C-alpha cells in the first residue's frame, strides 16, 4: 500500500490482556505457584510493549494508535461486519483467547455488539479436541482437520466414554479436568522456527479410558478411526444442542460463526443441515489471522 506510519490512523490488535483480567488473576492465585504467576504477568507486560518495538525499529511513536480489541469480539466481528445482514446471533469458540473459550453475542447493525454468554478457560472445546488430536498421533499445531477427516472412516462407538470427559454445564459444557494434563494448568505455546509446539494435553487417566496413544509413525487402526468418529459426533451434538437452545431463547434467524473451532467444516455442514437457523455466515478466515481483520472492522 506504500503507506507511512504517520498515515496510519490506528493499529488494531485482536487481543486485550486487560479483558477477563480479574478472572485470570484469581485463577492464577488458585492454581499456579508464585514464580509462574510472575512469569505470566511478565508475559502480559511484554505483549503490551508493541509500541516500544515500533519505536525501536521504525523510530516512530505509535502508542496512542494501538487499540487492543478483546479476542472473541474481534473473531465475531470478522464474520458479522463482512455480511450484509441486519442482525444475527454470534458464536465464537476456540482453544482460548483472553481467557475466554466461547463467547456468544447479539449482533445488530448500527448497535454495539452485546455479549450474552461466555465460557472461560480451562473449559474449552478447542483444547478438548486438541487433546484427542494429540492422542491419535497428530502432534502438530493445526492437525485437528486430520481428525475431522479420519472421523468419516469410523463409527461413534466410544461416545459413552467421551461423555465422562465433557458434560453439560450451567452455561454450556464443562470438562472433567482429571483427564487432562495442562502443565501448571495454563497452556503455553512455545515457538521454534515459527512453529508452535506444546506438551501432550491428555493425562494418564485419559489413557486408562482410551488405551495407549498412537505414535506419529504408528499405523492408523480401527480404534483410532472410531475414537475420531466418536469425538466428532460428540462435538456436533454438543454445539447443535446449544445453538438450538439459543435460537429458541433469542429468536434470531441468522447465525454467525467464528473462532478456530469453526474451521470444522463437518460441524458447519451439520449446522446448515440440522439447525433451525435460516442462514449460517462464516468469516473469510475464522482463525486468529481473520481476527486481526476483525479487530480493525470492529474499531
Located regions from the model:
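Short acidic/glycine-rich loops and adjacent helix/strand connectors
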Residues: 1-299
Amino acid at each position: 500500500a506504500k503507506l507511512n506510519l504517520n498515515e496510519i490512523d490506528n493499529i488494531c490488535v485482536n487481543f486485550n490482556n486487560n479483558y477477563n483480567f480479574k478472572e485470570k488473576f484469581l485463577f492464577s492465585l488458585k492454581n499456579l505457584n508464585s514464580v509462574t504467576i510472575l512469569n505470566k504477568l511478565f508475559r502480559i507486560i511484554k505483549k503490551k510493549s508493541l509500541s516500544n518495538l515500533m519505536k525501536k525499529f521504525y523510530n516512530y511513536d505509535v502508542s496512542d494508535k494501538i487499540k487492543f480489541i478483546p479476542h472473541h469480539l474481534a473473531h465475531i466481528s470478522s464474520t458479522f461486519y463482512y455480511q450484509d445482514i441486519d442482525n444475527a446471533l454470534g458464536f465464537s469458540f476456540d482453544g482460548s483467547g483472553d481467557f475466554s473459550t466461547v463467547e456468544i453475542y447479539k449482533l445488530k447493525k448500527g448497535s454495539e455488539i452485546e455479549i450474552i454468554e461466555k465460557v472461560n478457560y480451562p473449559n474449552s472445546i478447542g483444547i478438548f479436541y486438541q487433546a484427542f488430536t494429540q492422542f491419535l498421533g497428530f502432534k502438530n499445531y493445526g492437525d485437528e482437520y486430520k481428525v475431522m477427516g479420519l472421523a468419516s472412516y469410523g463409527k461413534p462407538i466410544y461416545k459413552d466414554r467421551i461423555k465422562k470427559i465433557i458434560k453439560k454445564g450451567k452455561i454450556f459444557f464443562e470438562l472433567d479436568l482429571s483427564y487432562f494434563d495442562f502443565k501448571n494448568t495454563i497452556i503455553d505455546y512455545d515457538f521454534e522456527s515459527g512453529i508452535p509446539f506444546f506438551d501432550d494435553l491428555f493425562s494418564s487417566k485419559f489413557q486408562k479410558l482410551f488405551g495407549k496413544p498412537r505414535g506419529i509413525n504408528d499405523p492408523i487402526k480401527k480404534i483410532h478411526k472410531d475414537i475420531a468418529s466418536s469425538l466428532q459426533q460428540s462435538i456436533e451434538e454438543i454445539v447443535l444442542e446449544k445453538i438450538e437452545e439459543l435460537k429458541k431463547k433469542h429468536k434470531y434467524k441468522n447465525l454467525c460463526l467464528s473462532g478456530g473451532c469453526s474451521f470444522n467444516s463437518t460441524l458447519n455442514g451439520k449446522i446448515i443441515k440440522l439447525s433451525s437457523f435460516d442462514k449460517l455466515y462464516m468469516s473469510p478466515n475464522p482463525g486468529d489471522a481473520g481476527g486481526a481483520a476483525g479487530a480493525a472492522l470492529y474499531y
